Design a protein with these regions (language model features):
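Conserved short histidine dyad/triad with adjacent acidic residue
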Residues: 24, 37-54
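Short, conserved beta-strand element in jelly-roll/cupin
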Residues: 42-44, 54-69
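A cytosolic small-molecule/anion-sensing beta-strand core signal
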Residues: 63-64, 79-80, 98
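Ligand-binding loop in jelly-roll beta-barrel domains
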Residues: 88-112
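Structural motif
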Residues: 37, 66-68, 75, 91, ...
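Short beta-strand His + acidic residue motifs that chelate non-heme Fe in jelly-roll/DSBH
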Residues: 49-51, 69-70, 86, 91-97
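A short, N-terminal "cap"/entry segment at the start of jelly-roll beta-barrel domains
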Residues: 1-35
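Short acidic-glycine-tyrosine-enriched beta hairpin
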Residues: 73-88
């Protein structure tokens, strides 16, 4: 699936804008700006994004399935409908013990300490 923004002023079901691809993590931009972005992300079972440290806080919402989010070596298990705010400057790993979809949102204020 192409990584382009969705059509503005047209209703959509966020779960349907991204599909699962075997052995992959798929990212689809919903809104992408210099000041931040919103993305739909699908994880196939067994996939992970690890060791990421962001200078920005990130809001994660699980929209289908269950996920494991590890923040500074502390595992947190999220199920459909649950959300978490990942603090800036923390090491984060997102694990798919089963396939799942999520929304990821971050907004840059311009005052973050970027190292």
């Amino acid at each position: 699936m192409e990584n382009t923004e969705l059509i503005k002023s047209k209703a959509f079901n966020v779960i349907e804008v991204i599909e699962y691809i075997p052995n992959s993590v798929v990212i689809r931009s919903i809104i992408k700006r210099i000041t931040g972005n919103i993305s739909a992300i699908s994880f196939d079972s067994g996939e992970l994004l690890h060791g990421k440290i962001s200078p920005f806080e990130t809001f994660i919402q699980i929209i289908e399935g269950n996920a494991e989010v590890v923040i500074d070596d502390k595992p947190i298990f999220l199920k459909t409908g649950q959300s978490i705010i990942i603090p800036a400057h923390t090491r984060t790993t997102i694990k798919a013990n089963e396939k799942f979809k999520m929304l990821s949102t971050f907004i840059k204020s311009g005052y973050e300490e970027v190292s």
